[in-house]
Structure formats: structure tokens, C-alpha cells
Regions:
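Acidic helix N-cap motif at the loop->helix transition within catalytic regions
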Residues: 33-37, 62-71, 114
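Short, acidic, metal-binding catalytic loop of nucleotide-sugar glycosyltransferases
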Residues: 40-51
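Glycine-rich, basic loop-to-helix element that forms the pyrophosphate-binding segment
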Residues: 80-97, 117, 154, 171
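N-terminal membrane-anchoring/stem segments of glycan-assembly enzymes
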Residues: 1-18
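Cell-envelope/extracellular polymer assembly enzymes that use nucleotide-activated donors
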Residues: 20-23, 53
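Conserved donor NDP-sugar-binding/catalytic core segment of glycosyltransferases
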Residues: 113-147
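A conserved acidic beta->alpha catalytic loop
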Residues: 41, 58-66, 82, 109
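Short aromatic/hydrophobic "clamp" motif used to bind/position activated sugar donors
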Residues: 102
Length: 177
């Protein structure tokens, strides 16, 4: 990586002006308890609300997730009663995407305020085909197990930064890509 960087300057894409429309696909399974928090998080994103379409895909949820989502008229909800898994749910949602950018996230993943702009900014580079988010685990003092998970994701993030510097991506965490 260091040798490559001696000969090639790092990329620094700019955010397109005007900002393009984007769709945020939110995968959910029995997420009744998190709907309100996720919607607050979505409303706090630093991206124009009129340019960010929110689509929730609930796959086989048998709690009150869909009822909670009815409280948000700006949201499109795609529900399937039979659970087929996250990949099938996301694939089912793709035909509803009418924007040039689609961003996948999970209902229980809270996004950084600038996440959408940062993802869109990276796509200004025509060589970019996928952008992966960086997962940060909030460590709960009473839950020692999350400390190990936090260390793992720091390691994964370091590997992804190396991937980026080599103009490649081996994978993306399912929480944000």
C-alpha cells in the first residue's frame, strides 16, 4: 500500500452539487421496539428530506413493526408475511428504487449524521462501485461481551481502510452499504 501511494495520489472525491436523490432501504424483522428511534435517527441525517426516500422492508415480522411504521406517512413499507431472509427482502425492494443511489441499512443500526453525504461523496469517483459504512459498537459497561465485538470491528475497519487504499473492497458489513 505504501509503495502504491508513492506513485498514486489518494482520491478525494467531492460531494455533487446539487445533491442527488437517494433511497435508504431499511431491513427490519420484528423491530417494533426500535422503529421510533430509527425514525428519529433518519430525520436527523444531514441530507435534505425531500431528496432522501425511506423504504422499510419488513420480512415476516409478527410483532407490531408494521403498525408502528404506519405512524410515518413519509415512509414506504414493503411487507411480506412469510419470512424469506434479509437478502430476499432487499432484492424484493430494488424494483421500488427510482433514485440514482440506494443505501442499505438495518433497522437497529443508527447512522452517523453525515453518513449519507459521505456515501454519496464517494460515488463521485467513477471508479467506485460500492461504499461500505464503518461499524462502531457502543460498549455497555454491564455487557462485557460487547467489548470483544468492538475490538473485532476496529480490526475490520482497519482492513477496509487498507482495501480502500488498494482500490478494492472484499466485503461490506450488512448494517450499512
Amino acid at each position: 500500500v505504501k509503495i502504491k501511494e508513492l506513485f498514486v495520489k489518494p482520491r478525494s472525491p467531492r460531494l455533487p452539487e446539487p445533491l442527488p436523490e437517494a433511497t435508504l432501504l431499511i431491513a427490519a424483522y420484528n423491530e417494533e421496539a426500535i422503529v421510533a428511534s430509527k425514525m428519529v435517527n433518519c430525520r436527523q441525517l444531514d441530507y435534505p428530506a425531500d431528496k432522501l426516500r425511506l423504504v422499510w422492508i419488513t420480512d415476516g415480522s409478527n410483532d407490531n413493526t408494521n403498525e408502528r411504521l404506519k405512524e410515518y406517512p413519509e415512509v414506504t413499507v414493503l411487507y411480506q408475511p412469510r419470512r424469506q431472509g434479509k437478502t430476499a427482502a432487499l432484492n424484493r425492494a430494488i424494483p421500488y428504487v427510482k433514485t440514482p443511489y440506494v443505501i442499505f441499512t438495518d433497522a437497529n443500526t443508527m447512522l452517523n449524521k453525515g453518513a449519507i453525504k459521505e456515501i454519496i461523496r464517494q460515488f463521485s469517483d467513477p471508479q467506485v462501485g460500492c461504499v461500505a459504512g464503518e461499524k462502531r459498537v457502543e460498549i455497555q459497561a454491564e455487557q462485557g461481551a460487547t467489548a470483544g465485538e468492538g475490538i473485532y470491528w476496529k480490526y475490520e475497519s482497519a482492513l477496509k481502510r487498507l482495501d480502500y487504499r488498494l482500490y478494492s473492497a472484499v466485503g461490506a458489513a450488512g448494517e450499512l452499504f
